[in-house]
């Protein structure tokens, strides 16, 4: 009679290097969009703050732009969440993909300026624990 060991992983989805690699064009596009939206939101918030400081009505175009940018950002972030892909540093474009390497749950680690997925790290070691993929 055999003994079966059932491993409970933290994440439901685990990416192979190839699966993560295939998503990079879309991930790059989303990272660029998120950074643009973050900058736009900052500008809109500064404008709205100035308007409220002056006692002006904050309705109108600026509020509409802010709401649209926020909704677009939330939509993109929902795509990351749905796929269980994690943005670790938006400004750097640092992204982690859950994976299994040698029966261990780890993250494949990628930055937006890297041409391909080449590194991994333990779940709790972060970027400083990056190692080349085997």
Stretches with model-predicted labels:
Residues 13-14, 74, 102:
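A generic "functional-site adjacency" signal
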Residues 13-16, 23, 30, 55, ...:
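Amphipathic alpha-helical coiled-coil segments and their boundaries
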Residues 6, 59, 71, 92-94:
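Residue-level detector of functional hotspots within protein domains
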Residues 39-44, 57-60, 70-72:
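Short acidic/polar alpha-helix capping motifs at helix-coil junctions
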Residues 43, 47-50, 54-57, 82, ...:
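Heptad-repeat coiled-coil alpha-helices
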Residues 78, 82-134:
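Glycine-rich, aromatic-bearing surface loops/beta-hairpins
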Residues 1-49:
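Long, hydrophobic N-terminal alpha-helical segment
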């Amino acid at each position: 009679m055999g003994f079966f060991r059932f491993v409970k992983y933290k994440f439901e989805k685990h990416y192979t290097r190839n699966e993560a690699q295939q998503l990079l064009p879309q991930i790059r596009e989303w990272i660029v969009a998120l950074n643009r939206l973050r900058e736009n939101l900052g500008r809109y918030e500064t404008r709205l703050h100035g308007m409220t400081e002056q006692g002006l009505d904050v309705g109108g175009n600026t509020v509409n732009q802010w709401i649209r940018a926020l909704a677009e950002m939330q939509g993109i972030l929902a795509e990351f969440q749905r796929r269980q892909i994690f943005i670790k540093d938006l400004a750097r474009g640092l992204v982690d993909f859950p994976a299994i390497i040698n029966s261990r749950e780890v993250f494949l680690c990628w930055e937006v300026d890297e041409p391909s997925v080449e590194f991994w790290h333990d779940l709790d070691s972060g970027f400083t624990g990056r190692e080349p993929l085997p």
